[in-house]
Regions:
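Lipid deacylating catalytic domains
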Residues: 1-67, 71, 84-135, 139-250
Length: 250
């Protein structure tokens, strides 16, 4: 089994594990190159669950979570934090950047037990005795966090989250396992958790530091106009540093 397992985020229902790996592997290799570390494709596996969201009209599919409803939920939460926020501008930003689609899939994951279980099983199937590093993006941080918590017997030592929405209360309160006294459980066998965030990424604005029962190391990056895209997160030197540390320790 691979030493590194990568868990994609929402919005990948029209892709597949090979196509995701073709984009993510070179980006991660560039991140590791900052530190003189080389990997080959056998070192990396993509835990793919995007097909669980891919339903065609021939299947008689009705979207379980309305995208407009997802936006309304976000608007309500943001307005609680800042009653003066321009909701029209917020809606425009969410729609133009496809966050409405991403939010709808995140909501479906949290609300549909069978989908949730199937996604977590995909992560479990990808992780083996040689896996030391898990890199997760966006919705993939929810799936991988819950899988890691459910399997403390795994040998994963390093957890790297990018574009991570885990710490937001609307997400964290619905995780399995749920927080206790305001603190969520540490993810299983993990020894080091590194969170990489672009401060302009709407998904990652709430830090997991201090909220998960252990020390999370966090680095801020600038992804330019691609604030939530995985590739600029992966090719960053801080991501490379965290993955390199996990490989060296293993």
């Amino acid at each position: 089994m691979s030493r590194i397992v990568m868990v994609h985020g929402a919005g990948n229902d029209l892709w597949g594990p090979s196509s995701i790996k073709s984009r993510w592997f070179p980006a991660l290799a560039d991140g590791l190159a900052w530190h003189g570390v080389a990997i080959d494709e056998h070192d990396v596996t993509v835990a793919f669950y995007g097909d669980l969201f891919r339903k065609d009209p021939e299947d008689g599919y009705e979207p379980a979570v309305d995208r407009a409803g997802a936006i309304a939920t976000v608007e309500e939460l943001v307005q609680r934090l800042d009653p003066h926020v321009d909701l029209a501008e917020l809606t425009k930003m969410l729609t133009e950047n496809h966050f409405d689609r991403l939010l709808a899939q995140a909501a479906a994951y949290l609300q549909q037990p069978s989908l949730r279980s199937a996604a977590r099983s995909r992560v479990a199937d990808a992780i083996g005795p040689d896996t030391r590093v898990v890199v997760a993006h966006s919705l993939g941080t929810l799936v991988s966090y819950e899988a890691l918590c459910a399997h403390p017997e795994w040998s994963v030592t390093d957890y790297i989250t990018i574009g991570c929405p885990l710490a937001g209360d609307i997400i964290r309160d619905r995780l399995d396992p749920a927080p206790s006294d305001g603190v969520s459980p540490w993810p299983g066998s993990v020894l080091r958790w590194t969170n990489i965030v672009d401060p302009n990424d709407p998904a990652g604005r709430t830090t997991p530091c201090g909220r998960f029962g252990g020390q999370v190391t966090e680095y801020k990056v600038d992804n330019g106009h691609r604030v939530h895209d995985p590739e600029p997160y992966l090719n960053n030197r801080w991501t490379g540093q965290a993955v390199a540390a996990g490989l060296a320790a293993g």
